[in-house]
């Protein structure tokens, strides 16, 4: 493995997560068949540029970021033909990060989305399907545009909505919060720096989702303000389905 942080390298080896971890990127990738980037999304462009001059012929490069259109564009521009890029998005993990939270069952029955374009190498896609399946994942392939639209709705929008709910709540009131509130807002405790990258990398889809959410909340707000019982029930029942 590779990490530019010495503390991370020491921790990974101490926990037995990696047998070899180095701080020199060129040394880490010189003879590798597969590279997986697990860094903030906006670091990918620079890594692709560096890797283009380091990787052996035929090497596959992937990532585990939750947005995919920009990484595909950067890979085309920076990696070119130096390596074969396929996007990966394993739907696993939690709001926690760091090698100390590694688990051997992390990918058991988890969905993993591979993203491809017309120019994606088919054999690289096949290899990655087999790789993620071997870890226990259920693999599906999408194009990056569809991926980013879907995950704006089911992953990124819920995160910003949770953040909005927390920010709209009084800190003193939250001392009395029960399981319902905590379940609704848990994801907002993910690292802000990571999520800022996600939001900016998929900003158009997320902004559209926020607009739809505001429209739905406005309907409910109006019904509540006007005391329209049937309309409130209708809106809540629609969500319950």
Feature-to-residue mapping (PLM):
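Rossmann-like NAD(P)(H) cofactor-binding subdomain of soluble oxidoreductases
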Residues: 47-100
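NAD(P)-binding Rossmann-fold cofactor-contacting core
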Residues: 1-17
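Short, well-ordered alpha-helix to beta-strand connector turns
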Residues: 18, 32, 58, 109-110, ...
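Short beta->alpha hinge that forms the Motif I/post-I loop of the SAM-binding pocket
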Residues: 4-5, 39-40, 64-66
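Short acidic-hydrophobic, aromatic-tinged amphipathic segments that line or gate anion-handling sites
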Residues: 19-24, 140-141
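Internal alpha-helical scaffold of NAD(P)-dependent oxidoreductase catalytic cores
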Residues: 104-189
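Rossmann-like NAD(P)-binding element
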Residues: 25-60
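Interdomain hinge/lid region at the active-site interface
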Residues: 172-240
């Amino acid at each position: 493995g590779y990490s530019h942080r010495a503390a991370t390298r020491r921790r990974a080896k101490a926990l037995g997560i990696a047998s070899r971890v180095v701080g020199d990127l060129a040394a880490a990738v010189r003879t590798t068949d597969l590279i997986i980037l697990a860094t903030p999304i906006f670091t990918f462009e620079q890594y692709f540029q560096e890797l283009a001059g380091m990787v052996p012929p035929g090497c596959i490069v992937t990532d585990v970021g939750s947005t995919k259109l920009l990484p595909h564009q950067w890979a085309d521009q920076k990696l070119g033909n130096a390596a074969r890029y396929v996007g990966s998005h394993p739907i696993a993990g939690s709001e926690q990060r760091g090698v100390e939270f590694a688990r051997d069952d992390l990918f058991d029955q988890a969905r993993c989305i591979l993203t491809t374009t017309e120019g994606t190498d088919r054999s690289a896609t096949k290899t990655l399907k087999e790789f993620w399946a071997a870890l226990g994942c259920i693999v599906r392939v999408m194009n990056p545009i569809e991926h980013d639209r879907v995950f704006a709705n089911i992953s990124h929008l819920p995160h910003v909505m949770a953040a909005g709910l927390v920010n709209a709540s009084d800190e003193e009131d939250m001392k009395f919060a029960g399981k319902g509130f905590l379940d609704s807002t848990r994801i907002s405790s993910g690292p802000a720096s990571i999520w800022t990258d996600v939001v900016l990398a998929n900003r158009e889809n997320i902004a559209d989702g926020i607009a739809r959410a505001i429209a739905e909340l406005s309907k409910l707000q109006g019904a509540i303000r006007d005391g329209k019982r049937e309309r409130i029930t209708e809106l809540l029942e629609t969500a319950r389905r």
